[in-house]
Amino acid sequence: MSDNTVLAPPTSNQGPTTPRKGPPKFKQRQTRQFKSKPPKKGVKGFGDDIPGMEGLGTDITVICPWEAFSHLELHELAQFGII
C-alpha cells in the first residue's frame, strides 16, 4: 500500500443542497374565542322595592362593573375582558 492515499470526503465550495428553513411561522388570530360563555350580569337596577326610590324605575344601569358582577371573582372578570 502506498502512504499517499488519503481517504477524505470530496470538498465542495457550495453549501448544502437543501435550503434551510427558519422556525415555523404562526398566524395570529384576529378574535379571541372563548370556550365557555361570558358570565351574566347580576342585578342592574334598584327597582321599586326600595322605599323612596319608587319613581326611578328598574332600568337604571350600574356604573361600576364590580357592582353588576359582584357575584364573581376577579379572575373570572379578567378572563372575559370585563376588567
Curated annotation (Swiss-Prot):
The keyword Hydrolase applies. Residues 1-51 are annotated as: Disordered. It comes from the Eukaryota. It is an enzyme of class 3 (hydrolase). Keywords: cGMP, Hydrolase, Sensory transduction, Vision. GO terms for cellular component: photoreceptor outer segment membrane. Participates in processes of transmission and amplification of the visual signal. cGMP-PDEs are the effector molecules in G-protein-mediated phototransduction in vertebrate rods and cones. This is Retinal cone rhodopsin-sensitive cGMP 3',5'-cyclic phosphodiesterase subunit gamma. It comes from Bos taurus (Bovine).
